[in-house]
Amino acid sequence: YEIHERLVGSEMCIRDSIAALLRKEYPECEVVLKKIVTKGDRILDVPLAQIGGKGLFTKEIEEDLLDGTVDLAVHSLKDMPTVLPEGLCLTAITERANVGDAFVSNKYATFEELPLGSVVGTSSLRRKAQLLAKRPDLEIRDLRGNVDTRLRKLDEGLYDAIILAAAGLERLGHGDRISSLIPADVCLPAVGQGALAIEARTADKEVRDMLSFLNDLNTKQATDAERAFLGLLEGGCQVPIGVHADVEGENIRIEAIIAALDGSTILRDTINGKADDAVSLGQQLGKKMLAAGGQEILASIL
């Protein structure tokens, strides 16, 4: 089986990849990695929000899936559009790793310690809006490139701190660079953050069945709720929307924010219910927040 993974500098660690898990589960199968640089990875001199379009980190990979070049694709779920191309499906969602955002600094231990006017690096509008809502004095500068590049820019003194997904740092062996985790009441994570998604052709039942062992039910229910919320708002990964669903037994709690780009307005709400109703609860929360002012916030952005 041939698998696509994004090639992002030195970031793809084969020992931690889905390929390694497949080889262990099915030692009789040959697993071949095909790597690709996507549009979102190639264009590094323009902020993601200005590139435009959805699927910046998935389009080229999905084209190879559809034409049969590869059998499955591995994505960070947070990069996946809520609507997939016809003929493709998410066949497994792995157990979620650390869902939070990491505060990384060589000078300060926590976000709260940053002095007035500190320079903070992030390429995420979601993070920028929420950080400015708490600290409008901060100077938020765009930060692109792979994880190694971003850490190097911090070490060169271009930023006082940078914000990265904690799961990504930990997967790549950079967990020791995390100064602290940013609390959810300061910065709610992105849809699907911390989970890996396995995409395959809908008609390829054999491959989909083989991948079922990778699926984590709690993570799937939580991320289904988050993606349902995002899908109802029709927001891509470059809109200031944060949402986190937490499954405890049979119950689920979903918390979400819709923010203005400058953080001047943030709408926050939660909903609770049964985990089996994850999708409908995510949609309910989306409708409620749109009616409460979210529509106006999004209209000012889109």
Stretches with model-predicted labels:
Residues 1-7, 13-14:
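Single conserved hydrophobic/aromatic residue that forms the stacking wall/gate
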